A protein has these predicted regions:
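Intrinsically disordered, glycine/charged-rich N-terminal periplasmic/extracytoplasmic linker segments
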Residues: 90, 96, 102-105, 130, ...
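A short beta-strand motif that forms part of the nucleic acid-binding face
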Residues: 82, 98, 115, 134, ...
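Intrinsically disordered, low-complexity terminal regions
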Residues: 1-67, 77, 120, 129, ...
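Extended interfacial segments that mediate partner engagement and assembly in macromolecular machines
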Residues: 44-111, 120-124
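Long, polar low-complexity repeats
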Residues: 107-136, 142-144
Length: 193
């Protein structure tokens, strides 16, 4: 019997088939449709214009700048600048200053302490945590937490919103049931630079 610790989960970008692959694998082929799937982590230290499609993690360093049509990954950690539509199967964490162009779709969305970031397109997440200044529109099918140093300047549509003492919400707050949030506005592609 094989132990679970030697395997990791993977999902095909093309057909959506979920399967297990070796923990140290850098790539895999989907057993259902045969499509190639990258499992490697990507780190951006300088300017890049390549679209990213991996089931690994993406790290954008402080001096990194990503201008691409799309980013598909497991977890995203951004300390630099990103101009792309982002789809994460896990967390999207931001600790940067400046403007982010492109829609963000993820499970957990976090703006860490020290950030001051403006999202020019909407953010769609299951769980949202804001510990710094954020400008933009948030759609969450779960809770939104605004920490004591957190501030959201923009509209929030969520299942629940919690604001710790010292936190701010400057905009409309819509509390709805989870299924209604899926009817948010359609995606608008970012302008090509």
């Amino acid at each position: 019997m094989y132990r679970n610790q030697y395997f990791k989960d993977a999902e095909c970008f093309d057909c959506g088939h979920k399967f297990k692959t070796g923990r140290s694998a850098k790539s895999a082929n989907c057993p259902a449709c045969g499509a190639y799937i990258s499992l490697e982590d990507v780190e951006i230290n300088m300017t890049s214009t390549q679209p990213i499609k991996t089931r690994g993690n993406v790290l954008i360093r402080k001096r990194g700048r990503l201008s691409a049509s799309s980013v598909q990954c497991r977890d995203l950690e951004c300390h630099g600048i990103i101009e792309a539509n982002v789809t994460c199967s896990g967390d999207a964490t931001f600790r940067t200053t400046g403007s982010i162009i492109g829609e963000i779709h993820c499970q957990r969305f976090v703006v860490e302490k020290g950030a001051d970031v403006a999202f020019l397109n909407s953010v769609h997440a299951t769980d949202v945590e804001v510990q710094a200044r954020l400008t933009g529109t948030i759609y969450s099918t779960g809770p939104v937490l605004i920490g004591s140093n957190g501030a959201i300047n923009g509209d929030v549509t969520a299942r629940s919103v919690s604001i710790e003492p010292g936190g701010e919400l400057n905009g409309a707050m819509n509390i709805v049931r989870g299924k209604q949030i899926a009817l948010s506005p359609p995606a608008v592609p970012p302008p090509v630079a």
